[in-house]
Amino acid sequence: MRLLIPLVFSSFIFFGCRTSSVSSTHTPPVLLDSSTISLTAVSEDSSYGYTEKNPIQTGGGAAGERRYLNALTGPNGETVTYVRLGSCCAFKTPNGIINNTGLLDKYEVRYEGLNKSVILYLNMYDTGEMKAPVNFGYKK
């Protein structure tokens, strides 16, 4: 028993202090406030966020997705509303929880003056450069 306690303690230190095998050179997003990230540009890529092949990489889990969506406006500063529709579209990522796999989240997004709501695809596992999608603006 006397040997078991130091052995368990040592294993916590050894395994708990190892570095991640996934490296990132991406800078964490700047926040406007605790629930909104700071965006600085609108994407010129018309597929950005609108397809599962080109999702918005928010990182930060569900909170990261909400911080991103809270930063969006309509093109003329209109207030944006959104509803999570669910998850889809399994993909491989070193940041996935089970078997290096993640799922994209689909959000229905709208603002006043938009004829039809749009669906945006967000990746909460990986972080990339975030911009507002085409036909959107962002809070300043």
Predicted regions and their residues:
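Positively charged n-region of N-terminal signal peptides that target proteins for export
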Residues: M1-L4
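N-terminal secretory-pathway/extracellular module detecting exported/lumenal segments
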Residues: S20-L103, G113-K140
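Sec-dependent N-terminal signal peptides
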Residues: P6-F12
